[in-house]
């Protein structure tokens, strides 16, 4: 497995994932110190990160498996009921929001399509990352690169037996066994690892899937599990440098 913790740069207000820099794709993820993304306008975010020359595209996220592909001349820059945004438009910056759910960043070397999906347990159960890959429709899965952002770690993600049974009844036994653990009679779910094995099962190359050991719950990020109704949202910003 490819863990890329050493490729993550920490700043006061955000972190930067540098793994996709070789594709000229930048990925930023805001910290709690920056504030809550829904309380800021897209114009404010663009100005704060020197992206005023970009078209900032975002959505109302509903834990769906809906993914949109934004074209060269986008008529819409805000999408309802959407949890994945893709584009090959170098003028677009994609803004998605999280508070423990897993950000999954995608880049296809052939089509130059890049994007982000919001995959909490509902998105994972609905296989939103597969919906995104299907939307890209690559000639070969060998050109697909996947980078997991920072979500909640399994040690802080306690779930009920009904949750476990729901996944066990739908997915291959070997994937479920590798991604659920039991401690003192409680179940814990590894969302990142589950998506890793799903992607391998789809046919994405293992050496093009990148993981990390970070955790929103333990670190200076917004976390719904930790802060409950007082939790804000972290923002993931993905764009192509030109």
Model-flagged regions — what are they?
Residues 1-242:
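Active-site microenvironment for binding and transforming phosphate-containing groups
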């Amino acid at each position: 497995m490819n863990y890329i913790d050493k490729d993550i740069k920490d700043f006061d207000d955000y972190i930067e994932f540098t793994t996709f820099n070789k594709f000229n794709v930048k990925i930023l993820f805001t910290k709690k110190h920056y504030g809550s993304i829904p309380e800021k306008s897209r114009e404010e975010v663009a100005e704060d990160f020197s992206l005023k020359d970009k078209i900032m595209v975002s959505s109302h996220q509903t834990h769906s498996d809906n993914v949109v592909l934004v074209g060269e001349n986008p008529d819409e820059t805000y999408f309802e009921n959407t949890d994945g945004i893709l584009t090959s438009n170098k003028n677009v910056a994609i803004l998605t929001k999280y508070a423990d759910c897993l950000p999954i960043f995608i880049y296809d070397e052939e089509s130059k399509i890049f994007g982000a999906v919001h995959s909490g347990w509902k998105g994972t159960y609905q296989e939103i990352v597969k919906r995104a890959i299907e939307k890209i429709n690559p000639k070969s899965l060998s050109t697909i690169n996947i980078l997991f952002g920072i979500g909640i770690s399994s040690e802080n993600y306690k779930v009920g037996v009904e949750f476990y049974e729901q996944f066990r009844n739908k997915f291959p036994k070997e994937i479920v066994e590798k991604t659920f653990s039991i401690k003192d009679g409680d179940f814990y779910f590894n969302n990142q690892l589950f998506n890793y094995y799903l992607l391998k099962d789809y046919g994405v190359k293992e050496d093009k899937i990148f993981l990390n050991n970070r955790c929103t719950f333990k670190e200076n990020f917004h976390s719904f599990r930790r802060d409950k109704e007082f939790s804000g949202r972290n923002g993931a910003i993905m764009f192509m440098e030109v």
